[in-house]
Amino acid sequence: MAVCIIDHDNIRGVIYFEPVHGKDKVLGSVIGLKSGTYNLIIHRYGDISRGCNSIGSPEIFIGNIFVNRYGVAYVYLDTDVNISTIIGKALSISKNDQRLACGVIGISYINEKIIHFLTINENGV
């Protein structure tokens, strides 16, 4: 399991990468964005020493997230990404090729509450 903490200006969130029932899932939530559609993209480097300017070129498009009128996005996406290959890279939230927020993807421990959340959502409840 991997996790990315986003904390840039007023944009905050937690994104998990987790295998669930044989499929890799991306899940979490993000707050602080304006209503609309945004891109989740994995970048080459996990270097955030200069914010999102030092994370390198985009490598993998994960998918779109949809921010509601309250500024909240609930993320639940399927992905073909091999989780072990993205550890140490960066995840960005972008719109119109502008990187709005980013964070480094790291290894996470298995949390029973997260597994319960995944199981509930996998079953459509």
UniProtKB/Swiss-Prot annotation:
The keyword Nucleus does not apply. One of its GO terms (molecular function) is metal ion binding. It comes from the Viruses. InterPro entries: SOD-like_Cu/Zn_dom_sf. Keywords: Disulfide bond, Host cytoplasm, Virion. One of its GO terms (biological process) is superoxide metabolic process. Transmembrane segments: none annotated. Disulfide bonds join 52-102. One of its GO terms (cellular component) is host cell cytoplasm. Coiled coil: none annotated. Its main location: virion. The keyword Disulfide bond applies. It is found in: Virion; Host cytoplasm. Belongs to the Cu-Zn superoxide dismutase family. Superoxide dismutase-like protein with no enzymatic activity. This is Cu-Zn superoxide dismutase-like protein OPG175.
